[in-house]
């Protein structure tokens, strides 16, 4: 049985992840962390029966991870929190599932180096949906055949999302850029801005949109649109739990959802 711990346990993603852990036959929740609601039962936020696991203060992360003998820590919080907590977990020998977006290149480098130094396993991905990762694969193939088309990415999310553009949009741009040998990115346009051969990335924020991503390949007299729409955060939570079950069977190293799904 895999012992799982969850950061941000009282939040929208954390509570869904806990709900999905309770449905797993291979994993059990042994710890849940947040900055508030300390001492309350984690099941209260996941809308399941009492689990007997109290919310622990994230300040006690190291102590609780060691006490509960956690095998894996799932983190869908914020960049400022992940850069602090991921090294602590890795230092405890705990494997990581990181879905936090908005990490700077410098923060990602620190996390990668810590994982490698401590010889733990990690899946790091901007999106844990099976569909989105197939979307990346389709976009990559399309780019190979449409290299002379103008390429634009439009993403839309709820009005509480902190980072823009989304990690998924940036990953889509990376996938296209890799397929085409390198492309410059332009995030939004204003004023006099003649279009070059860049990839344009545009962010929309409003209401309760879970996540929409569209890649447009636009040529003269025609265009192709490849789109993924998320209807529920459940797809991200299910993917995270799937990744956590998978990672504990792998050799130490850093993996992506492509590896988890065999894409």
Swiss-Prot record:
It comes from the Archaea. The lineage of its organism: Archaea, Methanobacteriati, Methanobacteriota, Stenosarchaea group, Methanomicrobia. The active site is at 157 (proton donor/acceptor), 161 (proton donor). The keyword Oxidoreductase applies. Coiled coil: none annotated. Keywords: Amino-acid biosynthesis, Cytoplasm, Diaminopimelate biosynthesis, Lysine biosynthesis, NAD, NADP, Oxidoreductase. It is found in: Cytoplasm. This is 4-hydroxy-tetrahydrodipicolinate reductase. It comes from Methanosarcina acetivorans (strain ATCC 35395 / DSM 2834 / JCM 12185 / C2A). InterPro entries: DapB_C (IPR022663), DapB_N (IPR000846), DapB_N_CS (IPR022664), DHDPR_bac (IPR023940), NAD(P)-bd_dom_sf (IPR036291). NAD(+) binds at residues 8-13, 34, 99-101, 125-128. GO terms for cellular component: cytoplasm. NCBIfam families: dapB. Its main location: cytoplasm. Belongs to the DapB family. It catalyses: (S)-2,3,4,5-tetrahydrodipicolinate + NAD(+) + H2O = (2S,4S)-4-hydroxy-2,3,4,5-tetrahydrodipicolinate + NADH + H(+); (S)-2,3,4,5-tetrahydrodipicolinate + NADP(+) + H2O = (2S,4S)-4-hydroxy-2,3,4,5-tetrahydrodipicolinate + NADPH + H(+). The keyword Metal-binding does not apply. Catalyzes the conversion of 4-hydroxy-tetrahydrodipicolinate (HTPA) to tetrahydrodipicolinate. Its EC number is 1.17.1.8. GO terms for biological process: diaminopimelate biosynthetic process; lysine biosynthetic process via diaminopimelate. (S)-2,3,4,5-tetrahydrodipicolinate binds at residues 158, 167-168. GO terms for molecular function: 4-hydroxy-tetrahydrodipicolinate reductase; NAD binding; NADP binding; oxidoreductase activity, acting on CH or CH2 groups, NAD or NADP as acceptor. Pathway: Amino-acid biosynthesis; L-lysine biosynthesis via DAP pathway; (S)-tetrahydrodipicolinate from L-aspartate: step 4/4.
């Amino acid at each position: 049985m895999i012992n799982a711990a969850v950061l941000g346990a009282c939040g929208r993603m954390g509570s869904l992840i806990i709900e999905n852990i309770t449905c797993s036959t291979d994993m059990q929740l042994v710890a849940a962390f947040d900055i508030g609601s300390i001492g309350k039962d984690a099941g209260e936020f996941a809308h399941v029966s009492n689990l007997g696991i109290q919310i622990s203060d994230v300040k006690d992360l190291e102590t609780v991870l060691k006490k509960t003998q956690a095998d894996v820590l799932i983190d869908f919080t914020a960049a400022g929190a992940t850069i602090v907590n991921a090294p602590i977990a890795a230092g405890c020998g705990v494997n990581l599932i990181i879905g936090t977006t908005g990490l700077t290149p410098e923060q990602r480098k620190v996390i990668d180096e810590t994982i490698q130094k401590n010889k733990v396993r990690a899946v790091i991905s901007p999106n844990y949906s099976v569909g989105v990762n197939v979307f990346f694969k389709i976009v990559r193939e399309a780019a190979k055949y449409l290299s002379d088309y103008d390429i634009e990415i439009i993403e839309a999310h709820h009005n509480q999302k902190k980072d823009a553009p989304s990690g998924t949009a940036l990953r889509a741009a990376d996938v296209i850029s890799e397929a085409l040998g390198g492309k410059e990115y332009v995030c939004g346009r204003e004023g006099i801005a003649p279009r070059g051969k860049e990839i344009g990335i545009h962010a929309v924020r409003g209401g309760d949109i879970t996540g929409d991503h569209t890649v447009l390949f636009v040529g003269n007299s025609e265009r192709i649109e490849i789109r993924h729409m998320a209807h529920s955060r459940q797809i991200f939570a299910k993917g995270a739990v799937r990744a956590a079950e998978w990672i504990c069977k792998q050799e130490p190293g850093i993996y992506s959802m492509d590896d988890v799904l065999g894409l």
